[in-house]
Amino acid sequence: MEKKVEAILEFDKIKKQLTEFASSSLGEQAILELAPATDFQVVQKTQLETEEGAKIIRLRGSAPITGLTDVFAHLKRLEIGGDLNGLEIYQIGSNLRVSRQMKNFMNDLLEIGVEIPLLGALSDELLVLKEVEEDIAISVDESGKVLDTASEALSTIRRTLRRTEDRVREKLESYLRDRNASKMLSDAVITIRNDRYVIPVKQEYKGHYGGIVHDQSASGQTLFIEPQSVVDLNNERKALQAKEKQEIERILAEISASLAAWINEIHHNTFILGRFDFIFAKARFGKAMKAVTPHLSDAGVVHLIAARHPLLDAAKVVANDIYLGEDFTTIVITGPNTGGKTITLKTLGLLTLMAQSGLQIPAQEDSTIAVFEHVFADIGDEQSIEQSLSTFSSHMTNIVSILENVNQKSLILYDELGAGTDPQEGAALAIAILDASHAKGASVVATTHYPELKAYGYNRVHATNASVEFNVETLSPTYKLLIGVPGRSNAFDISRRLGLSENIITEARSLVDTESADLNDMISSLEEKRNLAETEYEEARELARGADSLLKDLQKEISNYYQQKDKLIEQASEKAATIVEKAEAEAEEIIHELRTMQLNGAAGIKEHELIDAKTRLGNAKPKTINKTIPQAPKQKPHVFQEGDNVRVLSLGQKGTLLNKISDKEWNVQIGIIKMKIKTADLEYIQPEKPKKQRIITSVHSSGSPAKSELDLRGERYEDALQKVDKYLDEALLAGYPQVAIIHGKGTGALRTGVTEYLKNHRMVKSIRFGAAAEGGNGVTIVEFK
């Protein structure tokens, strides 16, 4: 890709903005070296890297890249046997710390199932040198100072040095406290000259303290004297300082030697961390721009949805759909100047360079952009931020160069093609250049104000017209790109709006040739039809929104119905269970009495006792509420057989047929009791069949109403997040004020991931772990706004 094109399309300004998102000079350097790739697979890989980086930023907010430094020069010195200073050693240690933190960070993401294959493989290349990192951490601080903990010898030397310095200061302070001090000293302070402690003595008292004169004031009235009493202590202090320096040099040399054994590993770690910084910078830049990862085409197909120029004010820039490469390969944008035509060219060109550099683009999801081998641009910079003039000859020189180098994998952007010369000749040249560009197989977008080119899109099957919408009411362009509608002159309409006489306008119209007038009328008709279509489209969208609102209300009512139904069924079930429990208890009591009677001998059971027991069993049946229900069609009576499960109607109990006594009577086993029961008192019980899943017809496309809880136990991390996302939408549609998400306790990884996701969901008001009765920290309760 030519550097000239990058400059014309202002790609350098994108890179400058991108550097603000880098955390280190390594990331910044990678950005400065960034250039659009032309190999399709390379572009795919860099886009996937950025997408994985964006996924991590969405999940974690940031990555542990802070503290990364360019240490390649330090490693060069180690390579030739040199020693490093304390700050250089600290910087290498900082990189080792970042390497370890980054590797752990990436491993944590991989363990919870986040799919980041490219960045996961990149982190696998990082080598953790924990012992080397720890040795550096106890040896030097961030300013490069060697710490007392670097060696026992250094710690001892420094303790002795501090004590010696204290003794020197104590001795000198005694002179300052002397009652004659104010007379003999210029100032009651201890200072340093030639790295030795001294006091300021007046000239006339220089012999009073003895010792060594190290300096004097500019006037000569004050001498800085090291009294004789501290000369030995100062000498001792200097000797200790020399020992300290020697020990520090030994420590730095020792650490440097240990680092020299790991030069290649540290070099590779630093390179990998620089890549991470670069990738995360791209991801954060994309997030700041509200950009998306585009689909890539290797066949020259471009379909940008709501594409925005990234260097224009995001609050003011007009988003446009730009499509090319399927139904046509050439777009000719016609219409007056200052209408936003050049911005369209630059938007397409700049977004192409960004995509081929692995950057996300400012457009909507599902946008597609092509990967080109060459992007050529001949753009007059009248509307560029960097303004300059261009002559016809310089434009033509540029076009000649383009046509010599273009191929079928090229995108050409022509701005005001054929301008700067006689209009008739310029229009003819423009048409010929467009035909020549198409013959080379290139994708072309060109702007022109020549009316002759308005018919180009109709006369060439490979081309289409386009224009930038102009609002005659406000006398200003809307900057909205209209593909398929050529631009038209608005001179008459504008003149009328500004008050020009209708007679003059009528005469002017009569002077316009019929063909041009017909063309303008055709364009005007197209615009009217398009505006009508847009109006009808908006009305249809409004109706669709209304229908959607009604649908949501209906879904809410259905959800409320099922909730109420479930509640009533639950209440009824509880009541029925209580009744049955009571009936079972009474039946057990009766059976116990009968068993006792049986143990006492059959002869002991009186007839009236059996009748009484039978009556009590009948009374123990749960009372049912008679309802008037449609009578089911009478079925053919069942022919009873031994082993059939039956219900004894008079007792309300289930039993099993043992043997047939006669057509009118059977022996029936009811629990532990064998009884003779009349056939008319028996009801056949069908064997239970597997229950079929009840299908509920719903207006919601996803099936039955959402439940008030979602069970994620056993799910993989990313699958779980997708289910949570879908479930929250369904729960919101169902109108639930709050829901429960069951993730289990386990290692806590799934719980942590779900919690982080919920914190960032725009419709979530609050989250909390469940109470003990709700499932504790194995459940998250979500309250909606």
UniProtKB/Swiss-Prot annotation:
Q: Which UniProt keywords apply?
A: ATP-binding, DNA-binding, Endonuclease, Hydrolase, Nuclease, Nucleotide-binding, RNA-binding, rRNA-binding
What would be one Pfam family of this protein? MSSS
- The entry's ATP-binding residues are G335, P336, N337, T338, G339, G340, K341, T342
Q: Which domain of life is it from?
A: Bacteria
**EC number per UniProt:** 3.1.-.-, 3.6.4.-
Smr domain residues are: 710-785
Q: Name one GO molecular function term.
A: mismatched DNA binding
What biological processes does GO assign it? mismatch repair; negative regulation of DNA recombination; rescue of stalled ribosome
Q: What class of enzyme is it?
A: hydrolase
Q: Which family does it belong to?
A: Belongs to the DNA mismatch repair MutS family. MutS2 subfamily.
Q: Subunit info?
A: Homodimer. Binds to stalled ribosomes, contacting rRNA.
Its biological purpose is as follows: Endonuclease that is involved in the suppression of homologous recombination and thus may have a key role in the control of bacterial genetic diversity.
Give the protein name, as stated in the record. Endonuclease MutS2
Instruction: Give the organism the record lists.
Output: Listeria monocytogenes serotype 4a (strain HCC23)
- Tell me the classification of the organism that encodes this protein: Bacteria, Bacillati, Bacillota, Bacilli, Bacillales
